[in-house]
Amino acid sequence: MGANEDQEMELEALRSIYEGDNSFRELSPVSFQYRIGEDGDPKAFLIEVSWTETYPQTAPVISMNAFFNNTISSAVKQSILAKLQEAVEVNLGTAMTYTLFEYAKDHKEQFMENHHPGNSATPVANIISVETPTTAPSSKKKEKKEQLSKAQKRKLADKTDHKGELPRGWNWVDVVKHLSKTGSKDDE
C-alpha cells in the first residue's frame, strides 16, 4: 500500500471516529486539530497534526502554535511536543494521528503538571510593556476626555476663542451692577 492509500484510509477512519466530536477539527485533508480538555478548562490545549507527503512512513508535523495555546508557557509546550515526538517514533510506519490524540488525552494531567493558569505565560500585552522603556506606562495613564455632543461642542466653541480658552474677564463682576444690588452704606 502506498502513502496516499494509507492516508486516505486513515482520513476515512478519523472522520468516522470523530464524527460529532466538537474537540476534533479537520483543517484540510492532511491537517487536523484536537482540543485536549473541556471548554473552560484552564489546562486545556490544542494539538495540530499535519501529514507530510510520505506520512505514515515519515513523522507528521505536530504543532501547538494555535492561538488557543497562548496561555501555556513555551517550556510546557516544548515538553508536550517532546513527549508526543517520542510517541511518533514508536508508531512510525503506522497510522498514528488517532493514537497521538488519544495519547495526549490519556496523559493530559502529566503534560500540564507544570502549567499554572494565569502565572505561567505572560499575555502579549505584558510582554510588550516589559520590553518598552519605563516612560511608556506614564503615557498610558492619560486622562480620558469627556465625550461631548455636537450641540455641546458648538456651544463651547461660541464661548471660547480659537485656542479653546475663555476670553479675558469672562467671570469678572460688573462693579456698577453689583453695587446697585447691594446698596450703599448710607441706606443702613
From Swiss-Prot:
In terms of Pfam families, this protein maps to: RWD (PF05773)
Where exactly are the transmembrane stretches of this chain? none
| Name recorded for this polypeptide | RWD domain-containing protein 4
User: Lineage of the native species?
Assistant: Eukaryota, Metazoa, Chordata, Craniata, Vertebrata
Using the UniProt annotation, give all residue ranges assigned to the region (Disordered): 132-167
Ranges annotated as biased composition (Basic and acidic residues): 155-166
The record places domain RWD at 9-111
Gene source species = Mus musculus
Task: Report the superkingdom from the record.
Answer: Eukaryota
